[in-house]
From Swiss-Prot:
Keywords: Cytoplasm, GTP-binding, Hydrolase, Magnesium, Metal-binding, Nucleotide-binding, Potassium, tRNA processing. Homodimer. Heterotetramer of two MnmE and two MnmG subunits. Its cofactor is K(+). Binds 1 potassium ion per subunit. It comes from Clostridium botulinum (strain Langeland / NCTC 10281 / Type F). InterPro entries: G_TrmE, GTP-bd, GTP-bd_TrmE_N, GTPase_MnmE, MnmE_dom2, MnmE_helical, P-loop_NTPase, Small_GTP-bd. GTP binds at residues 233-238, 252-258, 277-280. Mg(2+) binds at S237, T258. PROSITE patterns: G_TRME. Residues 223-383 form the TrmE-type G domain. The lineage of its organism: Bacteria, Bacillati, Bacillota, Clostridia, Eubacteriales. This is tRNA modification GTPase MnmE. (6S)-5-formyl-5,6,7,8-tetrahydrofolate binds at R23, E88, R127, K461. GO terms for cellular component: cytosol.
Amino acid sequence: MKEFDTIAAVATPVGEGGISIIRISGDKSLDIVSSIFKGKNDRTLDDIKPYSMRYGFIIEKESKEMIDEVLVSYMKGPRSFTAEDTLEINCHGGVIPTKKILKELIKSGARLAEPGEFTKRAFLNGRIDLSQAEAVIDIIRSKTDLSMKSALKQAEGTLSKEINSIRNRMIKIIAHIEATVDYPEDDLEEITGQKIKVDLKEIINKIDNLISASEEGKILREGLNTVIVGKPNVGKSSLLNALINENKAIVTEIPGTTRDVIEEYINIDGIPTKIVDTAGIRETEDVVEKIGVEKSKEKIDEADLVIFMLDLSKKIDEEDIEIMDFIKNKKYIVLLNKLDLNKDLNEENHFIKELDSKYIIKTSVKNNSGLNELKECIKNLFFSGEIKSDELTVTNARHQEALIRSRESCIQAIETLSDEISIDLASIDIRNAWKYLGEITGDTLDENIIDKIFSEFCLGK
């Protein structure tokens, strides 16, 4: 375990609430808290047992005045989150008492923790690996039950075990190659080369299984970025309101009412989906509306999915065709809206035939008709079959990239062996593949990148 100074931070959101928790970790944490704690009947923390709590007060050292009534819990390292001696002070959930207690801890010898420093210490002290540490922030940011369960599995080390299993197999192959080079025999090298190719193909298959679910995993982690587009007044804002079941966007008969981008998250069978309502795309001389149209186009570029809305009560025009041309390279669903007006758009229309989407849905957003079909289409576009929370899913783009690079190195090793080049050259590619997988767990990752990952965490975590 590494040696560090003692750090402190507020672990709960700032503001009014039932309680606030101030976390302190390091070898001097018990001494520091003891110096400002006064228990009932002048009891101290000298005899506090690990994994227990003690009632008392935090006292300002200089004035000897009481700051707040508290409960102090003590977790002795290495059996704590950071693998260090850790204390948590539970005080009343107000801004003033929380700040005053933290200030007193700093005055008594603790240092204000950096964002993510508690989790970083858990990683550096060997209690968790980097993929497990990243899962902590995924749990905090999860937007659906399914995304939380996926993050919890990663936090438990499910991904780490699979990665370590593959890396151990790679090390055995490298050792086999080195033994062959050290004790060369004409027929031994050929046999070893053939065996290594078989092993590498099995490893690639395992990596492929992880990569295949990574796009779905990325959506579970980051959400499905879904943008609603169409001309003004086709029902985009009404669709947003219907999907989130709230009157978030202003709906009027006046075209061009929505001039800015409105974003909300919804849960579609466990899939966190960000719904983005955009300004209607059309030619306009209105300066503000024109800015809104440009923002709409930017959001389309960023989208995972586009919902293209057409008005069943009106004929297709040049503006519809221009929008279609703009989204043709995206995944999209077409909504033929305003079915309730009974003015059915001619589905034999050449434009409708040209729509490159198997998902064309007639809807009446006003009457909530077709919304369930829309949600089912969204799920089917990105997920094959039922999404199961017990399956191992790669959710992090960094992990996906490392897997892809590792796979490429394995393929390069097979090509080297196939070209009958000296077998020890293949070990270079296999070692690179091993290194790339180690970036997922943090075993072979540059310290600056590790620092950047933890800097994205919140204070107190």
